[in-house]
Amino acid sequence: MKFSFLRRYCIALALLGGFLGLSQAATPRTVLVLGDSLSAEYGLPRGSGWVALLEQRLAAEKQAVRVVNASISGETTFGGRSRLAALLAQHQPTHVIIELGGNDALRGLALDATRANLEWMTQQSKKAGARVLLLGMQMPPNYGADYGRRFAGLFQQVARSEKVALLPFFLKGVADIPDAQRLFQSDRIHPTSEAQPLMLDNVWPELKKIL
């Protein structure tokens, strides 16, 4: 009698565990990418940018993850901030990748404002139940060592204060190599198609940790 009860109890637990496992596996996940031209396929054939390659990699790994690319060329952190609430409500992402800030620096916007916008977007994403990955950027040496250091530090400060994931330099292995020019379009600002897999390889390990 005791054996029969124990056996039925174990079977019930196994069935429940299987049900929960299936439920979790079936739970849809959505990654929202909020970025600028580096994520919007500027100057590239459609479907060749790192975000499109991310979709392909997730599919190859049979991960049920939907990717929404809400990136716009020329976007600043202020622009991203103004659009974020509507994007969160519409797509209800489980993960948000924020790739913004480069255009703020190129336009000479105040660093304090950039940091405040990044913090706000991170906080709102977290309040919506999403896990956040910040993609850090660095400026060329001609902007000055002090400015470059302070700009790069913004991303570290936000990630640390908000306790979110950080990729310190999105263009590592692309913009910081001796022959970097070959990986950039003629404007020397936007990476080529050849650089996109390298950019994804930078993002992937950090994203995979929080998926």
Which residues fall in each region the model found?
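Bacterial N-terminal signal peptides that target proteins for export
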Residues: 1-13
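Alpha-helical cap/lid subdomain in secreted, periplasmic
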Residues: 3, 63, 81-211
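Short gly/ser/thr-rich secondary-structure transition/capping motifs
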Residues: 14, 78-81
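Hydrophobic h-region of N-terminal signal peptides that target proteins for export
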Residues: 15-23
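Serine-esterase "nucleophile elbow" of acetyl-processing enzymes
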Residues: 25-73, 83-92
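Acidic/histidine-rich helix-loop elements
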Residues: 43, 68-77, 105-109, 188
